[in-house]
Regions:
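Iron-sulfur cluster-binding electron-transfer modules in prokaryotic oxidoreductases
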Residues: 1-174
Length: 174
């Protein structure tokens, strides 16, 4: 709904595979190689037709924007192809705040909430991509935003830490 209000043409890639982050973090590099190459080949079929690829999730956007290029450090052709794609890859909050009128749209919506909210930065947003102010700027348009104490503290998820080292917590959470 928001993208329509911003009058953006949206294309949802139907054949995109997993970005490969879970495999990358656990050392399953044959899987990373397969997934990244298949995605690069698929993205290349339409990337010149779009201005940007916006990804709402920090780990996937960091994987595609930065880690694919790093992963292919010994495969120059694939590294170059990943680098070319990375120029159009953006985390959604960064692109929407910097390239659209979303902040004004939210501010003029007439919706102001009294709830006090805080925002925890995903590590792959703040520490890898430098994205931390953009989500706050957008949230402040409709909410009272209060920074949490020790906002740089790790949430404990750590890529696949929750699934491996803290399996009982993950299972209990569902």
């Amino acid at each position: 709904k928001i993208l329509k209000k911003l009058e953006l043409d949206v294309m949802i890639p139907k054949k995109q595979l997993c970005c490969g982050a879970p495999a990358y973090f656990t050392g399953a590099f044959d899987t990373v190689d397969y997934l990244a190459k298949k995605n690069i080949e698929y993205f290349e079929t339409w990337i010149d037709e779009v201005d940007a690829v916006i990804i709402p999730e920090a780990t996937c956007s960091a994987m595609i924007k930065q880690d694919w290029e790093h992963y292919f450090h010994n495969q120059p052709e694939w590294k170059a192809r990943a680098k070319k794609l990375s120029e159009k890859i953006f985390m959604a909050t960064k692109w929407l705040e910097n390239n659209t009128d979303l902040k004004n749209l939210l501010a003029s919506s007439g919706k102001k909430f009294d709830e006090l909210v805080t925002y925890h930065d995903p590590c792959h947003a703040k520490k890898m991509q430098g994205i931390w102010q953009e989500p706050r700027n957008l949230l402040k348009q409709n909410y009272v935003l209060k920074e949490m104490s020790d906002s740089n503290r790790c949430c404990g998820f750590g890529g696949v830490t929750m699934q491996t080292e803290k399996y009982d917590f993950a299972k209990a959470a569902g």
